[in-house]
Structure formats: C-alpha cells, structure tokens
Amino acid sequence: MELSEMTKDERSLLLFLETQAVDYGGLVDVRRMNEGDCNIASDWNECGFIIYERISFYSIEAVSTPSRRPTHYVILSQEAFRLAHEERIARAVRMFQKRTWKKPGEEDE
C-alpha cells in the first residue's frame, strides 16, 4: 500500500490510530470514530495492516477515565507505522503552506 492510494479518510484514520498506539498504549475509544472509520479499521485488521480488536469486557472499567472509555485496542504493522510517518510529514507541509501567520521578515512581502 502507498500513501497516494489512500483516501483522505483513510489517511486521517491512520494518524488517529497511530496516536492511539503511541500515546494511549493502543487503547481506542470508538466514540471518537464514525461508522466509516470502524469499517476501514475492520478491513485493515482483516488484511493484517493493523490489529484492531475489542479489549476484554472486564478491562474496560479498569482503563476508563471520565473522558475516555476505550473498548478496543490497535497495534500497527511496520507498514502502517511507515505510512503514518509519511503522512505526518506530508500533513505538516500542507498545514504550514496554509498558515495564516507570518514569520519574522515576511511582513514586508
């Protein structure tokens, strides 16, 4: 799979899942995903791009907080991590090009 073959929704979901894997130990609160995201994640799970499954029912309470109630976990494959890294760089470039602020010295341009 290549980044250019992925839809905008797929790229966005990949970054979301990468964040869950890195910052939350893989725990995913599916309330932050829409039906399309869940379908994509399931498809990726089936083809081995990621591992995306429910956590044990008894673990849900133990890992929940007032603002997060994870019910699933994700593990990214090496390919998924590679593509997420590529997309982070591409997104940073796009966002910088869309910026509404100016760097010192640009005010006169």
Outline where the language-model segments fall.
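Short, Lys/Arg-rich nucleic-acid/phosphate-binding segment
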Residues: 54-61, 69
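Short amphipathic alpha-helical interaction segments
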Residues: 30-57
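Short, amphipathic alpha-helical interaction segments positioned at domain boundaries
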Residues: 63-109
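Ordered hydrophobic segments in well-structured contexts
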Residues: 13-16, 49-51, 72-75
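Short amphipathic alpha-helical interface segments
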Residues: 1-39, 85-103
